Amino acid sequence: MAAQRPLTIALVAGETSGDILGAGLIRALKARVPNARFVGVAGPRMQAEGCEAWYEMEELAVMGIVEVLGRLRRLLHIRADLTRRFTELKPDVFVGIDAPDFNITLEGNLKKQGIKTIHYVSPSVWAWRQKRVFKIGRSTHMVLAFLPFEKAFYDKFNVPCRFIGHTMADAMPLDPDKNAARDVLGIPHDAHCLALLPGSRGAEVEMLSADFLKTAQLLRQRYPDLEVVVPLVNAKRREQFEKIKAEVAPDLAVHLLDGMAREAMIASDAALLASGTAALECMLAKCPMVVGYRMKPFTFWLAKRLVKTEYVSLPNLLAGRELVKELLQEECEPQKLAEALLPLLANGKTSHAMHDTFRELHQQIRCNADEQAANAVLELAQ
């Protein structure tokens, strides 16, 4: 480290989740090195922790091929400018937080200039496009991984990787209070409760909502007291879901929630959800679940050929077995979904065993990730 200046850490976050991770990392580093300097591309949370923003995070938060193409010149300009400015600054460590398409090339540029680089949050290289691991290995001095099987994957290719645990596991209690969550949502303590989470993307809500609603109708026949909670990520998804519900299940009483997915999961006896981060959050909420997923036939055909893992949901990948039922494509239909959910709503042996395994997995990935990430940065800065 340079003797004449404070520890200098450069960071680039490209979206809200990265801003949250960056803020936690900065906080943990400041506790150890109070005069450290932080610069780069930052969102409001990182800036509130004292990160100097050369560019606003929104500049990078572009999704979809059309949107990316429309902004490509600007994105390439920003990356070239950051390469130049970071090379002049010579930070002790550069941390690229997620945003792999932007950050991994930037990390490679900086590594060639002798700057130590970390990629924080592994892309899903273990699942598909596995050859990306070689570019990651060339571009970074270390990957910080949320999940233990990610580290095992990098170890196979001799790419330095540290398992730091998952920040979501740190944020959620090992034993959530179901009745307190029900009080917040107005659900009676003695009722059966099912959460429906048809995804955060428009295409998911379009493909899954009708089957999820029909499943709830079937389950209501078995459990007349069944409360159905549906947390939706924003007003757009809510409007989309309401339209589908009006056509498919106009008489089905449900609690529509703006956000509040975590409360809905904690309050529920079982959840039916699309795969993705929601499945991990549901596991941490100790809510037994069934994963239902459907996509366009060609997309599914392509995914089957590209994806290298046996399971799609994180709880199953963590457990290394089918802990939760995954019903995909033509299997994702109301009768089969309802059959898989019935034993979970019964709140008997099946759901208790699932709950206990969820708790064990939670403990495995609850490692104080912010502190672990800060340790990695400081060790590399030596």
From Swiss-Prot:
It catalyses: 2-N,3-O-bis[(3R)-3-hydroxytetradecanoyl]-alpha-D-glucosaminyl 1-phosphate + UDP-2-N,3-O-bis[(3R)-3-hydroxytetradecanoyl]-alpha-D-glucosamine = lipid A disaccharide (E. coli) + UDP + H(+); a lipid X + a UDP-2-N,3-O-bis[(3R)-3-hydroxyacyl]-alpha-D-glucosamine = a lipid A disaccharide + UDP + H(+). InterPro entries: Glyco_trans_19 (IPR003835). GO terms for biological process: lipid A biosynthetic process. One of its GO terms (cellular component) is membrane. The keyword Magnesium does not apply. It is an enzyme of class 2 (transferase). Pathway: Glycolipid biosynthesis; lipid IV(A) biosynthesis; lipid IV(A) from (3R)-3-hydroxytetradecanoyl-[acyl-carrier-protein] and UDP-N-acetyl-alpha-D-glucosamine: step 5/6. Coiled coil: none annotated. Pfam families: LpxB. Its EC number is 2.4.1.182. The keyword Transferase applies. Keywords: Glycosyltransferase, Lipid A biosynthesis, Lipid biosynthesis, Lipid metabolism, Transferase. GO terms for molecular function: lipid-A-disaccharide synthase activity; phospholipid binding. Belongs to the LpxB family. Condensation of UDP-2,3-diacylglucosamine and 2,3-diacylglucosamine-1-phosphate to form lipid A disaccharide, a precursor of lipid A, a phosphorylated glycolipid that anchors the lipopolysaccharide to the outer membrane of the cell. HAMAP family: LpxB (MF_00392). NCBIfam families: lpxB (TIGR00215). This is Lipid-A-disaccharide synthase.
